[in-house]
Amino acid sequence: MGEQQQQVERQPDLPPGFRFHPTDEEIITFYLAPKVVDSRGFCVAAIGEVDLNKCEPWDLPGKAKMNGEKEWYFYCQKDRKYPTGMRTNRATEAGYWKATGKDKEIFRNHHMLIGMKKTLVFYKGRAPKGDKTNWVMHEYRLADASPPQPPPPPSSAEPPRQDDWAVCRIFHKSSGIKKPVQVPMQMPMQMQMPVAHQVPAANYQQQMAMASASIIQVPMQMQMPSMSDQLQMLDDFSTGSLMAPPPPPPSYSTLPGFPLQINGGAQQFVGNPSMYYQQQQQQQQQQMDMAAGGFVVSEPSSLVVSPQDAADQNNAADISSVACNMDATIWKY
């Protein structure tokens, strides 16, 4: 309870809604550089001092001056691994911090190098077989043009060098709010159109015009008979013989007993086809009788006859038959 009260007392008096979230350039310019110049006198309400080698990362949020944020800032001094060496000790009791990637250069006004940022990840266990965690640290330090020098002996009264101080930002990667992944709505399979048939909106009118221009217009004389005419034809053929005769040539006109009706350029057969063949057989029989009686009958030039020619042929056949009967009667007597 007493520790929580101390944490509340350490909180800076800021209006609601204010957050401490400086940029990399602001951290170097306004917080790290003044601390290096006056390490004892310079103090910031939002950044506390901590020894990272004696604290585990999950304990650091409780030691921050601004509690309740998703990232925490600390001043820390580098702990040399060896008194006369250059390597930094980054181990704790539970694990160690391991650098990852290259250091990032920080510029002022995009041309003046003022600092460097190093990214480290905390591993549980001992190197090199530690288990990686989601705790991440950004370590900010001033840029030094001169090569690094080993620290002075502990007996010296010389103040700490500028590369001994750093600003560390600690955060946990899983604590950030991730944006939900929006899955695009897909059309059902039966509603999807193949890619080959999808027409862009810009070319739709042009393609429709080309398609309409490519449609072949069927003339009236080439159109098929209507459904009612086809049914009538089937009805007429069904009343005739079971074996329907082959259709006559297209040049046929109207014949006795088997007229042809022209309707919109389509030829339709009307009547009983057997009547046409019976009449043809009768005409052939009459011609044979006339040839046997001594009459010379020439073969018709064409099977296509008009109604008037067919009537004349019938009258001629009747007259010839009467003449044959009269001749037979004369010769009989």
Swiss-Prot record:
Residues 143-162 are annotated as: Disordered. It comes from Oryza sativa subsp. japonica. The keyword Cell cycle does not apply. The gene is NAC26. Residues 147-157 have a biased composition (Pro residues). It is found in: Nucleus. Signal peptide: none annotated. The NAC domain includes a DNA binding domain and a dimerization domain. Transcription factor that acts redundantly with NAC20 to regulate the expression of genes involved in the biosynthesis of starch and storage proteins in grain. Directly binds to the promoters of starch synthase 1 (SS1), pullulanase (PUL), glutelin A1 (GLUA1), glutelins B4 and B5 (GLUB4 and GLUB5), alpha-globulin and 16 kDa prolamin, and activates their expression. It comes from the Eukaryota. One of its GO terms (molecular function) is DNA binding. Keywords: DNA-binding, Nucleus, Transcription, Transcription regulation. Disruption phenotype: No visible phenotype under normal growth conditions. The double mutant nac20 and nac26 exhibit a floury grain phenotype due to decreased starch and storage protein content. This is NAC domain-containing protein 26. PANTHER family: NAC DOMAIN-CONTAINING PROTEIN 87, PROTEIN CUP-SHAPED COTYLEDON 2-RELATED. GO terms for cellular component: nucleus. Residues 14-173 form the NAC domain. Residues 114-179 bind DNA. Forms homodimers. Forms heterodimers with NAC20. Forms heterodimers with NAC23. GO terms for biological process: positive regulation of DNA-templated transcription; regulation of endosperm development.
